[in-house]
């Protein structure tokens, strides 16, 4: 009887040892697979980041909104905008950007002796400057830019041949303009992204500085590779 009990205990101990060993081996295998999966995921993300931000060129375009002061004593008016840009990157972070913008709106001239209300105005800017991309992730990136150039103001296009100055508007002329802002990109693919750009535009029509704020939206296409 004693021998039978001893045999049962030995068998139970052996079975427990087998189960513990099997469970430990299974846990080790799961941990190894999880570690390998995490490593593969990190490697994939790094490859995507490399593929996305090793492009040498970016071309973009879209539309937006600008809050603009059209005369020294006039209220600010809302304008719709378009933008086209091209950027050449020397490395994944530093590049130079050239940009064309246009803005269209109706000036708030109030009551005048000419019986003209809210004449149409437009401005076109041509600027270039450095662009620095300081945040790069698999799907998102943020860059900042500073540009300077020339702005063409057309403030008498809707004034029915009345000089813009007589309506309280800036004179139609070409003046210096400058801008700073941030590009916030969301990448659908390594070569295609949606862009949101909060921006400041400084203009100097009439010999004074106008501080204008706006936001642009659009798409960006990336191509070529940095050598």
Please annotate each region the language model reported.
Residues 18-27:
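C-terminal segment of classical bacterial N-terminal signal peptides
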Residues 27-87, 224:
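Short glycine/proline- and aromatic-enriched beta-strand/turn motifs that initiate or cap beta-hairpins
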Residues 55, 76-82, 120-126, 172-178, ...:
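Residues that define the transmembrane beta-barrel architecture of outer-membrane proteins
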Residues 57, 93-98, 137-140, 186-194, ...:
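Repeated loop/turn-to-beta-strand initiation elements of outer-membrane beta-barrel proteins
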Residues 61-63, 84-88, 128-132, 148-150, ...:
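Residues on the lipid-exposed face of transmembrane beta-strands in outer-membrane beta-barrel proteins
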Residues 69-72, 109-119, 163-170, 201-207:
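Extracellular loop and loop/strand-boundary signature of outer-membrane beta-barrel proteins
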Residues 87-88, 92-163, 216:
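Gram-negative (and chloroplast) outer-membrane scaffold detector with strong preference
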Residues 211-227:
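Outer-membrane beta-barrel "beta-signal"
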């Amino acid at each position: 009887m004693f021998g039978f009990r001893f045999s049962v205990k030995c068998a139970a101990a052996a079975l427990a040892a087998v189960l513990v060993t099997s469970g430990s081996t299974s846990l080790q295998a799961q941990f190894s697979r999880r570690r390998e999966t995490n490593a593969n995921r990190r490697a994939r993300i790094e490859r995507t980041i490399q593929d996305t931000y090793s492009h040498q060129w970016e071309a973009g375009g879209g539309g937006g909104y600008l809050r603009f002061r059209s005369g020294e004593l006039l209220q600010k008016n809302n304008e719709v905008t378009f933008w086209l840009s091209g950027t050449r990157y020397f490395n994944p972070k530093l590049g130079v950007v050239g940009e064309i913008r246009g803005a269209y709106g109706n000036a708030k001239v109030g009551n005048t002796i000419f019986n003209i209300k809210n004449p149409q105005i437009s401005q076109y800017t041509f600027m270039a400057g450095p662009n620095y991309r300081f945040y790069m992730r698999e799907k998102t990136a943020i860059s900042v830019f500073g540009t300077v150039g020339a702005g063409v103001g057309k403030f008498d296009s809707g004034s029915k041949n009345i000089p813009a100055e007589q309506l309280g508007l800036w004179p139609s002329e070409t003046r210096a303009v400058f801008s700073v802002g941030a590009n916030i990109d969301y990448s659908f693919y390594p070569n295609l992204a949606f862009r949101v750009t909060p921006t400041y535009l400084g203009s100097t029509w009439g010999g004074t500085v106008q501080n204008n704020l706006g936001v642009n939206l659009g798409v960006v296409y990336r191509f070529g590779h940095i050598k």
